Every structure is written in C-alpha cells, then in structure tokens.
Amino acid sequence: MAPYEVTLGSIHFKAKADQRHLNPLGGVHGGFAATVLDSVTGCAVHTMLEAGVGYGTIDLNIKMCRPIPQNKELIAIGTVINMSKNLGISEGKIIDEEGKLYAHATATCMIIRA
C-alpha cells in the first residue's frame, strides 16, 4: 500500500492483495480491505490536523461490495466528511481503474490533543 495523492481532507493509495492476504478458502481475506480502509479513512483525517495532534479510530463500518481480486492494483480513497474539535468522520472506498466499487467504509476518529 502506498499513497500517491494527498490533499487537505483527502488521500489516495494504491493497494494490491497478494498471496499473503488469502484466507483458508483461497480468496482475499476481508481483513485486507478492512486494513486498507482503516488506513485511508484515518489518513484523510490526519491531513486535517495540526502538527503534534494525533487521532485514533473509534468506529469503522465496512461494506464489502464484491470480492477483492488477487494481484490487481486497486485504488483506495479516503475523504473527510466532517471535522470537529474532538471527532473526525471520514469515508473510504476501494475501486479499480474503471471505478468499480469493491468495498466502502465510514470511520469515526477521536482527535487526541496533548
């Protein structure tokens, strides 16, 4: 997984599931999508924070729309929906180059100020 576009309130990653991400039945484990979506939703919130301010995911809701393919580069996009003093709410999606949706998530992050 690697970021390739970052703007205020948004981040794009490229991600590819390989053999390490397979479940016992041979398909890509849902935990792969969960990890990718947790990362992009959190990183989107992170783009809105001042230096020295942290965050932690307190809620992650994932909808699997279709099986994640193995060995295909996918795009993961995280976007902030709402920011307040204590919470950041964001959404994420995993799509392919044609825009086909594989998974969608919403996340709530607690803002941690020192």
Language model regions located:
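Hydrophobic beta-strand-centered segment that forms part of the acyl-chain substrate-binding groove
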Residues: 44-75
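Active-site helix/loop of acyl-thioester processing domains in fatty-acid/polyketide metabolism
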Residues: 31-51
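Conserved beta-strand segments that form the floor/walls of ligand-binding pockets within enzyme
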Residues: 12, 16, 27, 57-63, ...
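Catalytic strand-loop segment that frames the active site of acyl-thioester-processing enzymes
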Residues: 1-28
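Hydrophobic/aromatic beta-strand elements that line small-molecule binding cavities or substrate pockets
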Residues: 1-2, 62, 92, 108
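HotDog/MaoC-like acyl-thioester-processing domains
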Residues: 68-114
